[in-house]
Amino acid sequence: MCIRDSNTSEQYFFDVNEKDPKPKLIKKRQRGILYSVNSWDGKFYNHTNENAEDFKIDISDSLEKPDWKTFIAAKDEVLIGGLTFLKNWIIRSETSDALDKLFVKNITTGIEEELIFSDETVYVPGASLMQRDKNTDEIYISYSSPKTQSRVYSYNLNSKEKKLVKEQEIPSGHNPEDYIVERIDCRSHDGRMVPLTITRHKNTKLDGSAKLLLYGYGSYGSSMNPSFSTTRLSLINRDIIWVTAHIRGGMEKGMKWWKEGKLLNKKNTFED
């Protein structure tokens, strides 16, 4: 059982096999500290921002007298996501520099690998477990990029075989190879580097004659993921270069990126 708001959480546990179970507190709530504990195969995993601004994941054999040890260490300006469990695999996500990444750890070997299933450098991946069978080695991966329409693949974690299951239909037709996507960093007023995602048609001239539309949104921790948009492409097809600035106020570079663009720091959003 979990009680939480935007910056505080408290969680209780009990043994479902007990006749008259009494909820037990895992950790007393503390302002500014978020945590979420999940169990799998006799282990307990704590996704928390305690002493880790962009979160970390600790592991313990017990909740009665927990002895938390590092499972996934905190990283500067890398937002650590939660865990998804299968019988033989642990799947997790990270976000840094306005890019999401997926990692898969083999429980038997202890080896963790990043799931790389495209040669594109700017894209949005996502893993989902649409089946109830936790014994499976197959997951579904959603994928899109500024030039590639939304796709869903089935992916076998053992064989690494990938199959296209569904693709977003574009009635007017669409060829991703007609577009070029680039990522650069731009220095803001205080020296912080702001990621820019640039999308253009391959035939658009870079001689200064093309129009450019600069878009940015940085509020409430909402990240502007580099995903696909038919509306955007209708402009790009008219030789307009589209640039998305991943400015502060979102969480493209972690919690600090958000905090540097809110409240008394809101000016940074507009300066970026």
Language-model-derived ranges and their functions:
Residues 1-5:
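Conserved small/polar residues in nucleotide/adenosyl-binding loops
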Residues 6-13, 52-59, 98-104, 147-154:
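Structural motif
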Residues 12-14, 27-29, 35-38, 49, ...:
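A structural signal for the main folded, soluble domain(s) of proteins
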Residues 16-34, 61-84, 108-129, 158-178:
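Multi-bladed beta-propeller domains
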Residues 25-47, 74-89, 93, 121-142, ...:
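Conserved beta-propeller blade repeats
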Residues 124-272:
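Serine-hydrolase catalytic core recognition
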